[in-house]
Design a protein with these regions (language model features):
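Phosphate/dinucleotide-binding and metal-coordinating scaffold of catalytic cores
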Residues: 1-109
């Protein structure tokens, strides 16, 4: 997995989620912001041209992750460190129950 993931709202590219050594960053896509029907990915992350920063994975995205038995099964199957929430999100975030999905950024995209 990469350290960059594309966040979609109902199949529309809403923004880019990045993980660096020190911080997580989320930025809405400029084309998404121009869409009159654009909705924020979370009430805690209103639509804005400014970037959001956090020392840990943003709570909204962390809440997309499985818990308990499902988390145990997922990390065992994928062989991902339980604390590597960003890579875990890129796997499980591709098929969520709600309107938001998170997919790894493909090279050259």
């Amino acid at each position: 997995m990469t350290d960059n993931a594309v966040v979609y709202y109902k199949e529309k590219k809403a923004g880019l989620l990045k993980k660096t050594e020190d911080v997580y960053e989320f930025e809405y896509d400029s084309d998404y912001l121009k869409d009159a029907e654009a909705k924020p990915v979370s009430l805690t992350m209103p639509l804005t041209q400014k970037k959001y920063f956090s020392e840990r994975l943003f709570p909204f995205f962390e809440n997309l992750l499985p818990e308990g038995f499902l988390l145990d099964m997922t990390i065992a199957k994928l062989k991902i460190d339980r604390n590597d929430k960003f890579n875990l999100l890129q796997y499980v975030g591709q098929d969520t129950v709600g309107a938001i999905s998170v997919k790894p950024l493909k090279e050259g995209a």
